[in-house]
Each structure stands twice: as C-alpha cells, then as structure tokens.
Amino acid sequence: MSIMVEVYGDYAAFNRPELKVERMTYDVITPSAARGILDAILWHPGMRWVVDKIYVLSPIQYANIRRNEVKSKISARNVRTVMNGRKNDLYIDAQADIQQRAALVLKNVHYVLEAHFDMTDKASPTDSPAKFQEMMKRRLEKGQCYHQPYFGCREFPAKFRKWEFKTVNTAYPNTTKELGLMLYDMDYGKGEITPMYFNAVLKNGVLDLTNCEVYR
C-alpha cells in the first residue's frame, strides 16, 4: 500500500559527500533524506519505508549562505577514556572552535513523496500493514511526528501534510534532466557503513526510484 506525502520548506541542504569543506547541495532531495522525513512522522521497528517516486513541484532554486560551524569533533579515544572512568575533557568549546563555511543550498523546496512500507522481521503478531497504514493516515491528518522533519539539516525544518489530489503537477513537465550520480542510501548490513549511489534522472519532474540501478 502506497501513500503520498507533501513536504515543503524555505531551505534545504542535501550535501554532496565528495565536497567535504564547502557545502554544496544536490539538485533535489535524496531518497535517504526523503525516507528520513517519513521516519520522523512514523517510525516502528516492524516496518521500513521505501520511497518509490519523488515529485518536484517547485523549480530548482539555489542560495549562497554562510553558516557557523565547529571545526573539530570529539574523538572516539576521548569517549573511550571517559567510559573507562578516567577524567578527560568531553566537550567542544563552540566559541573557540567556531568557523564560518560557505554553503550552496536549495530554497523554496516543494515535493510530493510517494512511498510504501515493507514489514520487517521485528514486527509483532499484532502488527499488520493495515495498522501501520491507518497510523500514518492519522498522523498526517493531525500533523503529528516523533521529531521535527527536516531537509538535510535541522536548521531547515520540513512542513508536511497528506497529498489530497489524484494527480501531481510538477515544475518540469515534458522535460528530462540528468542529475548525475546521487546518494541513494547507506548500507549498514555487513558491519561497516557503505554508501550506495544511483544515476538520477528527473523525467517530467519525477525522480522514479522503482527500478533504479544502485551502485556500491
């Protein structure tokens, strides 16, 4: 059973992993970010969201901004030291460690996410597809979520609601846009985190993920 969710917001940043210093966003929301929004609305160990299609409702627009970030991170060695009972500084001084970085972000983003969910082996005997479908429907109608959905960064919150129409008019009808390699998701299955990519093609304003080939 599929569901359609409308998401929109002022800014978004789906940062390309190959550009580590200056932040540069992908042209549209990534499948993993879309799944993260759905998880923020309804997450349960007995189900897993699968994004089928992403409809782009607003033209792709960019904005250059500068953001305050910290230039270091807490090391795993310091964490282990504190866990073993020894004293060590386990914090970052944001005032002393602050730096500004440029970022190319998206603005005025507006999508419709078409998705379904698969049941997992962690589902209990009382769990069923109809149960989860009804739970998602109620949460969309009431605007409920487990935590605030966001577009790539928590500074860019995503508003959401159920898509009430039978058709979707995109910003790019009768147009095909090659978006290049895009992050699909992260594979956590074999003890190490492996990024997965796919060749993103925006056809008639729709990013179709149903039969895309994934590269590791």
Task: Label each region the model flagged.
Residues 1-21:
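N-terminal, Lys/Arg- and Ser/Thr-rich interaction peptides
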Residues 69, 79-216:
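Internal, well-folded beta-alpha domain core
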Residues 1-3, 45-47, 52, 107-113:
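Structural beta-strand/beta-sheet cores of well-ordered domains, especially the beta-sheet scaffolds
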Residues 13-15, 62, 121-123:
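Residue-level signal for secondary-structure boundary sites
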Residues 19, 24-69:
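Glycine/small-residue-rich interface belts in oligomeric ring/scaffold proteins
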Residues 7-11, 58, 113-121:
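Beta-strand elements of well-folded, non-transmembrane domains
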Residues 9-11, 55-56, 70-73:
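A short glycine/small-residue-enriched secondary-structure motif
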